[in-house]
């Protein structure tokens, strides 16, 4: 658990399955005492011993509404907990907090992730639109999930996912950018989330392209053999 003394009672207002493995949940509660920035995470207690953090797609303190997209991969207690959620369920929401946040001073933003990153990417996209900033989103997804971004109004390039070569298609896509585009986007803020190995490889590529380390914000959501990073 990473948030101490920041617990707010919430109730599940409604749920919707965009796909058998992609569930949207809207939570409602008094969030007026909280402060949210795009990119921050919230946390739920999912069992007596387990906590899981998620990045909201929408968080509105004034209206008391929080929306989360859950990737139901079926591999752990977090997935099972999210699948069981239904209207009327009550729980405590912890946060928001975490080290990732929208870099307001920048006008160019690039988000990378996978199925576990949809909420983060949508939240950052909507923030960028509101600011009039330029935004690009790259997602490595299983082929059967390539339609997911469109289903949730996320403008993203869906790329193939490889177990053996993490982020390979995303790296090839970035390396194919013409020099003129790199000159324009080299000072961008890069938000890297999802699989730890993919983040490591993308980060290495960006550094080799001359992107400064302070422009790269990372948040690994999962890694092989580890439960709930």
Please describe what each predicted stretch is:
Residues 1-229:
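Extended, composition-driven regions rather than compact fold-specific motifs
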């Amino acid at each position: 658990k990473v948030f101490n003394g920041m617990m707010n009672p919430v109730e599940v207002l409604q749920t919707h399955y965009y796909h058998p493995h992609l569930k949207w949940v809207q939570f409602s509660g008094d969030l007026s005492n909280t402060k949210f920035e795009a990119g921050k995470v919230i946390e739920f207690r999912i069992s007596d011993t387990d906590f899981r953090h998620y990045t909201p797609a929408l968080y509105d303190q004034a209206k008391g509404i929080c929306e989360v997209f859950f990737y139901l991969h079926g591999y752990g207690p977090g997935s099972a907990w999210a699948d069981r959620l239904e209207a009327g369920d009550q729980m405590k929401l912890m946060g928001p907090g975490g080290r990732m946040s929208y870099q307001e001073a920048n006008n160019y933003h690039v988000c990378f992730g996978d199925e576990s990153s949809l909420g983060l990417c949508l939240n950052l996209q909507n923030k960028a639109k509101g600011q009039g900033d330029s935004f690009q989103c790259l997602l490595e997804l299983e082929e059967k999930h390539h339609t997911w971004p469109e289903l949730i109004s996320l403008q993203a390039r869906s790329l193939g996912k490889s177990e053996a070569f993490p982020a390979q298609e995303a790296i090839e896509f970035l390396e194919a950018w013409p020099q003129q585009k790199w000159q324009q986007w080299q000072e961008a803020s890069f938000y890297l989330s999802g699989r730890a190995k993919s983040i490591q490889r993308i980060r290495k590529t960006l550094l080799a392209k001359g992107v400064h380390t302070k422009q790269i914000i990372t948040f690994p959501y999962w890694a092989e053999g580890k439960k709930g990073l």
